[in-house]
Amino acid sequence: HHLKQVPVAVERREPVEVVSGDRDLFQVVRSEPTPVQVVYVGRGLAKAETIGPAELANRYGLPEAGAGPGYADLAALRGDPSDGLPGVPGIGEKTAATLISRFGSMEGLLAALDDPQSALAAGIRAKLRAARDYLELAPSVVRVATDAPVRKDRDDTLPAEPADPAALTALQQKWGLGTAVDRLVAALAAHR
């Protein structure tokens, strides 16, 4: 599993929004059994984007069904220098997306590589063959864990007001938080 990330537990009952500036988490995007979207803040909060299966498919040329897992396979093929993944030499993002779209997954692509009758072009086949060891290992590094246990032992709804207004006021004054805390309290009250 992806070594850089804290494992992401995808709740199985309610829609999930993952807020992150790391595109690696695009792989958890899905429609079913429960919707999962990534609120991508990699270019700052003011430019936050909500990425669901349709947006992921449009951005990277992947099929909408399975766009999340397809993104992980695309990343393994094209490489990701920030994660130390070299990718397959000569396979860029567009070719990777085409291969994942055509063969469905890394597993499907490797099966096509092993099948001399498959529709793989000779040049692509040679590049993939040369990187076979990498292709068998990369998915286990790229994929994030989605099965971490999630304890729901507290109410996760936003409070309508601070639990201890006096303590909050003391912290606000001590740290000079002024209007930031006032805006937070107003936002909580408005969210009721």
Question: What is each PLM-predicted segment?
Answer:
Residues 1-151:
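Extended two-metal-dependent nuclease catalytic cores across DNA- and RNA-processing enzymes
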Residues 130, 140-192:
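Low-complexity, acidic/Ser/Thr- and charged residue-rich accessory regions of DNA metabolism proteins
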